[in-house]
A protein has these predicted regions:
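N-terminal auxiliary segments of SAM/dcSAM-dependent transferases
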Residues: 6-9, 16-165
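Conserved alpha-helix/loop element of class I SAM-dependent methyltransferases that forms part
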Residues: 173, 187-201
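Conserved acidic E/D residue at the C-terminus of a beta-strand in Rossmann-like folds
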Residues: 228-232
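Surface-exposed cleft-lining segments at the edges of enzyme active sites
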Residues: 178-187
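Short polybasic amphipathic segments
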Residues: 171-177
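Conserved SAM-binding loop of SAM-dependent methyltransferases across substrates and taxa
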Residues: 211-222
């Protein structure tokens, strides 16, 4: 059994969590530590279907019900397993229960088939190209690799990252300066543009091309008359 276990008395879910209040600055610090762990280590959880089956069988039905009631499981044990394993690997001693519950509830098991059939991902082919320190290439997420799929959840009391993972490998265009990723067509980039892409209409001015995802997608909209791109 991993660090995410149950107290023998209340049978309540606990991980590296403590049942006390937390202020917003504390949640920001925890989220920053999680962000660093992801960006610096590209962590992934290696597991098989057999691992999932055996892990699930270690829980009683009452424990699964308690986890579900507490907001850790939403019917998808695989998602719970991956996020649990990642959270237990973090170099953080104490994480408040309210933060952990929000972290698990926001997490997503991303659909690799939907991502790879995105019109841009499916149709735009790139050839690896290097000019000086700049490299245009393909990046990837392997099965179980932890990523942030969208901007963090923010309200008056808490800031929590939106964690996700794919159940099989995916690849996508990316631009690097040296070893530093500058821009890529990854889930977080796509999701950050969704609202603007939905609202795009008429004559659209795009400031900065990036890898061209935004203008490519809106060019298919009948409501968009023209697209002007300004790139410095």
């Amino acid at each position: 059994m991993t660090q995410l276990q149950f107290s023998e008395s209340a049978r309540c879910c606990r991980s590296k969590e403590r049942a006390i209040s937390m202020n917003k600055n504390e949640s920001i610090a925890i989220s920053a530590a999680i962000g660093r762990a992801i960006s610096e280590n590209a962590p992934y959880i290696a597991y098989s279907d057999t691992d999932l089956k055996h892990d699930y069988e270690e829980y009683t039905s009452d424990e699964i019900s308690a986890l579900t009631k507490a907001g850790y499981i939403d019917g998808d044990f695989e998602k719970f397993f991956v996020i649990r394993e990642f959270s237990n690997s973090l170099p953080i001693d104490d994480i408040p229960g309210a933060y952990m519950r929000r972290l698990f509830s926001l997490a997503k098991k991303l659909d690799a088939d939907i991502f790879m059939h995105d019109p841009y991902i499916e149709n735009v082919k790139i050839k690896e190209t290097r000019r000086g320190k700049i490299l245009l290439t393909k990046a990837d997420y392997v099965r179980g690799e932890i990523l942030q799929y969208d901007m963090p959840y923010i309200d008056d009391d808490i800031v929590v990252p939106r964690l996700g993972f794919f159940t099989k490998s995916v690849c996508f265009p990316a631009l690097y300066e040296g070893t530093v990723p500058w821009v890529s067509v990854c889930p977080s980039e796509i999701n950050s543009m969704k609202e603007q892409m939905e609202r795009a209409c008429g004559r659209v001015l795009v400031l900065g091309l990036g890898l061209g995802y935004f203008p490519y997608i809106i060019s298919a909209k009948s409501s968009v008359e023209s697209i002007t791109i300004v790139e410095l």
